[in-house]
């Protein structure tokens, strides 16, 4: 049978398109997980900076308190300039990439420097560490006219009309900040609290809320608020509320919420390796793994009985165990390896946060059937 010939005229555009796609893939800056700021390394710094765009670079350390305070402002800046063609917003972790920071004279954190287009000679930024001031600086130095992006808040705003319906909901765990607009400590907490709300925005059973206690004094007095900010936790089983006396860094809040609400998030809002796991079903999965096929059917039946006892998100996650066990019975144990690899490929793609949650939970449960 004759093999059909492909015209060079048809293949050339295909090769050109492929080459363009590859060039874009290799040229595209590496954005840090969970934000809109380009994460630079020792190997990528001079490939990105000093080229055909101006760059604002923050040199930071993960443990630095001033860097943590700057983070939400800098991320807001990054989101605003993400689509700008002539400038970009970047950062370097100086704990991980010491040689870069040393080369550019960084001796304290955070250090913010402007690198003009085509130059590796920086200009140190000495202004205020707010998104507004930084944007004005970048627009002046880079010749741009970018407006700051409006980032929708994930904090639920409470008042007399909705306080009881939200806070006293027996199906939800609520953290409430009672604040005053003029309070300095409240202003310091605000970006951290906003970040916390963003971390749990996909968890229906968790609500991060605040109340202007200066404006709504009756509600503040009802719950014994005498100073600002006061944080109170209203869990499903205690709608009288309990004082939150922990630390006020994002790590502290995330640890508290995970422990109290049974969630499994990190500070970037991503699910951890424990998300979706249920101890009683993990034990049955291990038993299932080591059993012969006939015995596996009996264990599957035990799993189904266990899942019936669960409620809320645990019941939903329990169904994942059942589905995986049935797939293994139908397709053999290779299913776990192939499905895990498929999920890992999907997680590398651009997918919605809710879909990423779904895939991570399934991947976590699969791990109990494969170890």
From Swiss-Prot:
Enzyme class: isomerase
UniProt superkingdom: Eukaryota
Residue pairs linked by disulfide bridges in the UniProt entry: 64-67, 183-186
EC code(s) of this entry: 5.3.4.1
Annotated site residues (Contributes to redox potential value) in this chain: 65-66, 184-185
Positions of the record's site feature: Lowers pKa of C-terminal Cys of first active site: 129
Protein name: Protein disulfide isomerase-like 2-2
Keywords linked to the UniProt accession: Disulfide bond, Isomerase, Redox-active center, Repeat, Secreted, Signal
Reactions catalysed, as given in the entry: Catalyzes the rearrangement of -S-S- bonds in proteins
Bilayer-crossing regions: none
Function: Acts as a protein-folding catalyst that interacts with nascent polypeptides to catalyze the formation, isomerization, and reduction or oxidation of disulfide bonds. May play a role in storage protein biogenesis.
Molecular function per GO: protein disulfide isomerase activity
Major subcellular location class: secreted
Keyword Ubl conjugation attributed: no
Any Gene Ontology CC annotation: extracellular region
Record-marked site positions (Lowers pKa of C-terminal Cys of second active site): 248
Signal sequence bounds: 1-27
Gene name, Swiss-Prot/TrEMBL: PDIL2-2
Gene Ontology BP term (one): protein folding
Active site positions, chain numbering: 64 (nucleophile), 67 (nucleophile), 183 (nucleophile), 186 (nucleophile)
Alphabetized Gene3D superfamilies for the sequence: Endoplasmic reticulum resident protein 29, C-terminal domain, Glutaredoxin
Family that this chain belongs to: Belongs to the protein disulfide isomerase family.
Localization annotation: Secreted
